Amino acid sequence: MFAVIKTGGKQYRVAANDTITIASLAGEAGEAVTFGEVLLFADGAGATQVGAPTLSGISVTGEIVRHGRDKKVIAFKKRRRQNSRRKRGHRQDHTVVRITGISA
């Protein structure tokens, strides 16, 4: 059994006991989180439900494992022969979530 959920503008294929890294969510480690935007649901018997765009009555629950930050991305601009350059770093926040179940 698996589902495709949408969170943070991206889509993720999840099943029970999966661990996913998504955009930053509010909440502390250990808190429960519910994803209501389910785009696709497939049970183990071969039946698949596809939403248009989402499915109602199906939700995915998870637990926040930890919060963290991605590797640094460097934005570097240089204007040749002008002795002009700019270097800026950015680290995006993320949240690691363990999927606890899919309720249909």
Swiss-Prot record:
HAMAP family for the chain: Ribosomal_bL21
Annotated source species: Methylobacterium radiotolerans (strain ATCC 27329 / DSM 1819 / JCM 2831 / NBRC 15690 / NCIMB 10815 / 0-1)
GO CC list: cytoplasm; ribonucleoprotein complex; ribosome
Keywords: Ribonucleoprotein, Ribosomal protein, RNA-binding, rRNA-binding
Record's protein name: Large ribosomal subunit protein bL21
Superkingdom as given in the UniProt entry: Bacteria
InterPro entries with a match to the protein in the record: bL21-like, bL21-like_sf, Ribosomal_bL21
One matching Pfam family: Ribosomal_L21p
GO biological-process terms attached to the record: translation
Family assignment from sequence similarity: Belongs to the bacterial ribosomal protein bL21 family.
Assembly: Part of the 50S ribosomal subunit. Contacts protein L20.
Function: This protein binds to 23S rRNA in the presence of protein L20.
Region feature (Disordered): 78-104
Molecular function as annotated in GO: rRNA binding; structural constituent of ribosome
Lineage: Bacteria, Pseudomonadati, Pseudomonadota, Alphaproteobacteria, Hyphomicrobiales
